[in-house]
Amino acid sequence: MKTLSYLLLVFAILPCIALAQLLNQSEPLPGVTSSGQPDAAELAGLAEKGFVAVIDLRGESEDRGFNESSVVEELGMQYVSIPMSGSEAVNYDNAATLDSILKTAGGPVLVHCASGNRAGALLSLRQMLIGEDADSALATGIAGGLTSPALREVVESKLSER
């Protein structure tokens, strides 16, 4: 009986542990978690928590260590790739794509890159696109993982264009 109780406890907390271990994890918006690269176990934890989609901002040439799209789809979540390599990819077209996905997802979504910086950057532009002022949009991006001074400059420049 003791062993059964222990196993039940372990399986009950595994999804929570997986979610808590995401690299640079934050929840900058309700229903939107941003982070660095998750592994397969962390993705399984997200599926257990009811996440419906994973938005991968990493470029095609970036090594993930596993076939992320296959794992996400096998777990019953939608996989979306918005490849963002280089500062020119921090743009309002990609922000509009992100906005469309977030509006139609129907549940919690993970937005990730390698470290969380691109996730925060794109979330900033998305917030500006939907009508937030530049300061609020930037604050959302910072809350979403935007920590790189160089990328922040790019975001601030893009925000000032609107």
Q: Where in the sequence are the language-model features?
A:
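A phosphate-binding catalytic loop at a beta-strand-loop-alpha-helix junction
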Residues: 110-120
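N-terminal hydrophobic targeting signals that begin at the initiator methionine
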Residues: 1-2
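Cys-dependent protein tyrosine phosphatase-like superfamily
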Residues: 16-109, 124-162
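Bacterial N-terminal signal peptides
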Residues: 5-17
